[in-house]
């Protein structure tokens, strides 16, 4: 999901998506440790998606304070 698409979502929706992505990341790391993960690039994709969403949330916090 791109940053522009994330900005169109409500903050509560973004937080829910972050939560679900963190759960997915946990499962991916578990699969990696047990040798079951085939697509290791997915870990990087999920981490970057979480970072994008957290960035948008932080931008909103900063703009609300100004």
Curated annotation (Swiss-Prot):
Any one Gene Ontology molecular-function term assigned to this protein's record: structural constituent of ribosome
InterPro entries in the record: Ribosomal_protein_uL29 (IPR050063), Ribosomal_uL29 (IPR001854), Ribosomal_uL29_CS (IPR018254), Ribosomal_uL29_sf (IPR036049)
One GO biological process term: translation
Highest taxon in the source lineage: Bacteria
Alphabetical keyword list: Ribonucleoprotein, Ribosomal protein
GO CC term (a single one): cytosolic large ribosomal subunit
CDD domains, per database record: Ribosomal_L29_HIP (cd00427)
Keyword Ribonucleoprotein found: yes
Pfam families associated with the record: Ribosomal_L29 (PF00831)
Family: Belongs to the universal ribosomal protein uL29 family.
NCBIfam families xref list: L29 (TIGR00012)
UniProt name for this protein: Large ribosomal subunit protein uL29
Organism: Lysinibacillus sphaericus (strain C3-41)
């Amino acid at each position: 999901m791109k940053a522009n698409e994330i900005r169109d979502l409500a903050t509560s929706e973004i937080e829910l998506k972050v939560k679900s992505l963190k759960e997915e990341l946990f499962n991916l790391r578990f699969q990696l440790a047990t040798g079951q993960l085939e697509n290791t690039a997915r870990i990087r994709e999920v981490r970057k998606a979480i970072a994008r969403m957290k960035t948008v949330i932080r931008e909103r916090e900063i703009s609300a304070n100004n």
